[in-house]
Amino acid sequence: MKRFLLSFVLILCLVFGINNHAIAKDNIEAIETISQIGSLANSGNYMQALDKCNQALKKYPKEPDLYYWKASIQSSINQKHEALENFNKAIALDSKEATYYVVRGICKMDLNDYTGAEADFNKAIELNPNDATAFTMRGCAKLAQGNIDGANNDLTKANELVDVQEGIISK
């Protein structure tokens, strides 16, 4: 039964994009809460998701995924500076999660900090060299800074990665 439950939780994490932080803490309630927040946010119920996230952060203040979701929601409702603070908190708690750097970089681009965004995309690529989104966004940051050749190289690499990933999926 325990093995089945763990398998079910891992499937939920894959479906809802949850990292393994809450799993490492062996806390099913935290996983369920993060899943609910993600579902609310993904369906456009931002204020309800934000409220649930704030409540969860009182209970799980060291859970980086909660800061990630809070920041993502804040970014969606145009609270970019607040979002940046929460992306920073997520990264402070887990500096090995490439996704956090990508989304923080996107937030920095929204704030016209293209140099900072490029640095975040560099870190994401260092952590996950097959992240097509990181290459795409770094290309956009380079383009915004006038580095057309660098942007072209990154966008070409992103396309190659997408082609490889599509090939794997279609097999």
Enumerate the predicted regions with their spans.
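Alpha-helical tetratricopeptide repeat
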Residues: 2-171
